Amino acid sequence: MAATDLERVSSAEPEPRSLSLGGHVGFDSLPDQLVSKSVTQGFSFNILCVGETGIGKSTLMNTLFNTTFETEEASHHEACVRLRPQTYDLQESNVHLKLTIVDAVGFGDQINKDESYRPIVDYIDAQFENYLQEELKIRRSLFDYHDTRIHVCLYFITPTGHSLKSLDLVTMKKLDSKVNIIPIIAKADTISKSELHKFKIKIMGELVSNGVQIYQFPTDDEAVAEINAVMNAHLPFAVVGSTEEVKVGNKLVRARQYPWGVVQVENENHCDFVKLREMLIRVNMEDLREQTHSRHYELYRRCKLEEMGFQDSDGDSQPFSLQETYEAKRKEFLSELQRKEEEMRQMFVNKVKETELELKEKERELHEKFEHLKRVHQEEKRKVEEKRRELEEETNAFNRRKAAVEALQSQALHATSQQPLRKDKDKKKASGWSSIYSVTIP
């Protein structure tokens, strides 16, 4: 026999032998121990409600759990989709349930609905990431950890009676690999029974043709296989929610009162509310929790670990150790870092060269501009000098003319001042002669 065959035989696990017990041992109480531990620890269940504002999400939650949850009134004017989680502690008999209801506020209210699903996907991934980080801790405490992973998404469909909106198809397609989707037709009392039946068939046909995987109630457990198979044929559930009590006959029932009659919430002839409650809470709640952990979370965890460099070993190869994975990832990181550093260095060198060329070009342009301005300045200076010389010549000529004029004016003034003096002398001479003549003549 070859060495490889010997290794294969030695590595094969032996078949366990079945033995009969000679008396009572006591490990048949393990289920009771598990139940007792689970009851002591309590349970958590997280519901995501996706649907347009005013479609009845809060009312249906109140009706499902037969209580009134305090919620804020949603507005139709939300700028974007916002996830609003609220956690409640519920007690039924001796079972404690930590219920978290996450409402997609503002879904479908925007004009541009292309990215309406993005905040929902990011929220679901964020809860997976939180759980993964808790698992990867050296000192982890999953027993006390508040698990916020979404266990079921109730997708509320507007009762148009025609077909699914493109927003519904795109959103459910983005969510089906991350969460258990149960589609429900809200406000089913607004359309007739015949239209409702056609609408259900139309919805399921569109989901199948577009490859949308919704949650199917499990049929592998014999205890619930029959009822789950029947309920799978009723999807999507057409529901009516109400917390008001109306008197019908001699008893009060939760119903909606209309002028034409009463729609009873828990009457299966009126709507599928009872079917939804049975499938969601009383029959398949634990399966929803298990599917979230074993299917959706494991898919997210596997993708994240593969991104970190971890991978499963083949049957014929040696298993990878954590140290080997770390070293391989470290080498990959260092080589990538070195490559990035070289790229950045080369980029820096190229940038420096480009900057030097730009600076030289700027320097040349500035030098040319300086020379041009220098020539312009010299030309302006020459013109100013010419203007100054012309102005000086004009000033000198003006001064010469002014001096000549002033000389002429002084001469004329002198001449005019001499003329009255002669006249006075002539008058005096004339008066003297006349007096002489007057004396001599008797």
From Swiss-Prot:
Location of the Septin-type G domain: 41-307
Binding site for GTP: 51-58, 106, 187-195, 241, 256
Record keywords: Acetylation, Cell projection, Coiled coil, Cytoplasm, Cytoplasmic vesicle, Cytoskeleton, GTP-binding, Membrane, Nucleotide-binding, Phosphoprotein, Synapse
Region: Disordered, residue numbers: 1-23, 377-442
Record InterPro entries: G_SEPTIN_dom (IPR030379), P-loop_NTPase (IPR027417), Septin (IPR016491)
Chain positions with Phosphoserine modification: 10
Entry's Gene Ontology cellular component terms: axon; cytoskeleton; presynapse; synaptic vesicle membrane
CDD domains membership: CDC_Septin
Residue span of region G4 motif: 186-189
GO biological process entries: regulation of intracellular protein transport; regulation of protein stability; regulation of SNARE complex assembly
Start and end residues of each stretch annotated as G3 motif: 103-106
GO molecular function: GTP binding
Keyword Cytoplasm listed: yes
Family according to the record: Belongs to the TRAFAC class TrmE-Era-EngA-EngB-Septin-like GTPase superfamily. Septin GTPase family.
Subunit structure: Septins polymerize into heterooligomeric protein complexes that form filaments, and can associate with cellular membranes, actin filaments and microtubules. GTPase activity is required for filament formation. Interacts with CDK14, SEPTIN4, SEPTIN5 and SEPTIN7. Interacts with VAMP2; the interaction inhibits interaction of VAMP2 with SYP. Interacts with STX1A.
Record-given protein name: Septin-8
